[in-house]
Amino acid sequence: MKRDVFSSGFTRREVLALGTGAAAALAVPELSRAAAPATTVAIVRCRSYSDFRAKLATAFDQIGGIQKLVQGKTVGLKLNLTGNPARFPLTPNLPYRTNGDTVANTVYLLAKAGAKRVRIIESFFPATEDLGLWARYGIDVNAVNNMGTKVDWENVQNLGKYKQYVRLKVPWGGYMYPAYYLNQAFVDCDVYASLSKLKNHWIAGVTMSMKNNFGDTPCSLYGGDCGSDGNEHPTKERGPVLHQGKTKAPKGVDAELHPDSPRDPGYRVPRILVDQVGIRPVDLAIVDGVETVRGGEGPWLPGLERMTPGVIIAGRNPVCVDTVGMAVMSYSAKADRGSSPFVRGDNSLKLAEAVGIGTTDLNRIEIAGLSIAEAKIDFGPGAVGKTMKELKAEQKS
């Protein structure tokens, strides 16, 4: 598949065909019109992060192992470090971000399976490549660097160490945009893994292995202060461009397919996140439900509270994994907008299923390890601005 790259000048004449230097870039498969694929999903019990390595290894074994997937390969590992720590510092009693121990132990298992390199990927502010910034999230960079394989740390909020962006076309034409420009770290890996949390989301209803990829888009091009020419030193998040559609992306970046479509974030966010999964398919989905939160994605939201499901969910297909994750949260992946947990937005899992990424039919998904009944925990109605205690008090009154 031919890709375009986009340099920091941000003009149309600088949109070039990706050359031979990117021959190893990801080939996005054409999606079949047949039934969306179903793969095995593992659920394992894990009550403590001290057991995470052994339990995740068990989950990998239950889905058929990962050696064939990663041996001799470069693996991209996308984290979920949502929330600027300058405003929202580490909050141990609200474990809504990727846990540092899960990063180290996942890298260890990838190395043990033969991965030659792991690119740890996330977008955050400030948009620099300072390794010290990762420690703000409780990640021991030195420990991760000594897990048995070469490790690169990529803040993909802008160009980073690269000179050009890569243009990735959405295989089915796109829900919101026909293509997106990303940092080249996303194609400088043979395998792409999503390490996410099991939690609610204010707009998307839930956030797991698929929603984790919404942050793939660089704020230099899709942030609120991207301007008409792009901004390699962004300070504003994606709301004006992606969530609300009030601000256009810079010159040279693909425009929306349907500018007359709703400006409602509940319409836009689910479709953009499915586009993101389409342009950079998830080869390995890991959902951390050891400790997490319910009621939303972070402490800027009312009603957020700690949850301890004590599970890890893993598989090769993000839709299948998130479908099982929803069942563990006591939700249905078949639910429509307006029913729990899709209080404010459309169901991204059904949108992904519609374009052939994966199935939301639990009857077609083989579940290894714990059964859903054994793992299930009540996450309540979703992100409604109230804790479970407050909701129960309302029911009694």
Segments predicted by a language model, with ranges:
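Extended, low-polarity segments enriched in aliphatic/aromatic residues
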Residues: 35-397
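Sec/Tat signal peptide C-region and signal peptidase I cleavage site
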Residues: 31-33
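Sec-dependent signal peptide hydrophobic core
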Residues: 19-23, 193
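Functionally engaged cysteine thiol sites
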Residues: 7, 19, 298
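N-terminal secretory signal peptides
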Residues: 1-10
